[in-house]
Amino acid sequence: MRVHVVSDVHGNSRDLAAAGTGADALVCLGDLVLFLDYADHSRGIFPDLFGAANAGALVELRTARRFEEARELGRRLWGELDGTGVSRESVIEGAVRRQYAELFAAFPTPTYATYGNVDIPRLWPEYAEPGTTVLDGQRVEIGGRVFGFVGGGLATPMLPQALNSVRAGETPIPYVISDDEYAAKIEAVGEVDVLCTHIPPDVPELCYDTVARRFERGSAALLHAIRTTRPRYSLFGHVHQPLARRVRIGGTECVNVGHFNATGTPYVLEW
């Protein structure tokens, strides 16, 4: 049995269309939407709305850790859009829908997918075709092994939770939930052979992004589940340039499957 696993697709529909080649199934761990490509400032929703020059300026400010200036730039640009009478929510949703139409059409059959923190779960049923199974806090058998899926990201002190979306520097983050909600989904999955999540367990070397130079949120509940239920694999993404791509915890191989938008190459799981 051969399963290909991708995460952090961020608009890379071209490589996604070939990601299932030679595999019996594809697993996607979310973050389909591309809001802003740090490597190519012309790609994504932000440059489509505000131009590549403004996108480049925003990336430069964030990379230099001048976050307040980055937020001010975002507020100014969004404020100008608001001044035209156009709803920013409708503009963003329209752009996300266009990306989803292209990305979901690229999924092979069968595909098993869960949400990332930049995805909009309520839209997925409109685009998921019969060969795509969406799971969140649920489990499924693939080739005789049980896979559990938990989607979404966690709120942080600087990224407060909201009912519909939250904004950090005026960037929409639609699927961020509380620690308690996340832990409940982990518990609902129970004992599995392969535990598939968007975010990593709360292990420093798995959570630290060496390019962004910051720790992303990992899940303590996920780490506890790995230690107590001992799945064969814990597969995740979210951190694009982690300090460590894999760590062994007891008998569990914990693997960041890679930043698919940049690599175009799936992680391969065989048994």
Regions found by a protein language model. Give the residues of each.
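Proline-aspartate-enriched helix->loop->beta-strand connector
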Residues: 25, 192, 219-236
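Charged helix-capping and loop-helix junction motifs
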Residues: 97-98, 131-132, 211-222
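Core catalytic region of metal-dependent phosphoesterases/phosphodiesterases
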Residues: 6, 11-142, 257
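Active-site environment of divalent metal-dependent phosphoester hydrolases
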Residues: 10-15, 33-37, 114-124, 155-160, ...
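Binuclear metal-dependent phosphoesterase catalytic core
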Residues: 139-144, 160, 223-228, 241-271
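Extreme N-terminal starter segment of soluble prokaryotic enzymes
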Residues: 1-4
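Short hydrophobic patches on amphipathic alpha-helices
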Residues: 20, 104, 186-187, 226
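Active-site-proximal loop/helix segment associated with metal-binding centers of metalloenzymes
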Residues: 36-43, 47-86, 145-212
